[in-house]
């Protein structure tokens, strides 16, 4: 896993697994709402009444509807060097 994805992937995966409704703000100001169905290095699949593939380079902010707890190192995640 590259260093740039050490926070992004677990965060998005937690939102996906817990089916947390999210608001995604795009760089042009548009707000999208739904649940994260899937994601990869370049896109997020957002499901509402329809599924939308949103390119990550177009995303400004991802806002969950409720607080989420990320897995800690003691729950199976390996800490990044220097972040322990």
From Swiss-Prot:
InterPro entries: Hfq, LSM_dom_sf, Sm
UniProt GO BP: regulation of DNA-templated transcription; regulation of RNA stability; regulation of translation, ncRNA-mediated
PROSITE patterns: SM
A GO CC annotation given for this chain: cytosol
Key words of the record: RNA-binding, Stress response
Pfam families: Hfq
Origin superkingdom: Bacteria
Domain spans labelled Sm: 9-68
GO molecular function: RNA binding
Family label: Belongs to the Hfq family.
Role according to the record: RNA chaperone that binds small regulatory RNA (sRNAs) and mRNAs to facilitate mRNA translational regulation in response to envelope stress, environmental stress and changes in metabolite concentrations. Also binds with high specificity to tRNAs.
Complex and partners: Homohexamer.
Name of this protein: RNA-binding protein Hfq
């Amino acid at each position: 896993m590259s260093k740039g994805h050490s926070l992004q992937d677990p965060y998005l995966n937690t939102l996906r697994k817990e089916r947390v409704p999210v608001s995604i703000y795009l760089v042009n100001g548009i707000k999208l709402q739904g649940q994260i169905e899937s994601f990869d290095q370049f896109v997020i699949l957002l499901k509402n009444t329809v599924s939308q593939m949103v390119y990550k380079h177009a995303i400004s902010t991802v806002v969950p509807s409720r607080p989420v707890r990320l897995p800690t190192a003691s729950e199976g995640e390996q800490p990044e060097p220097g972040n322990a």
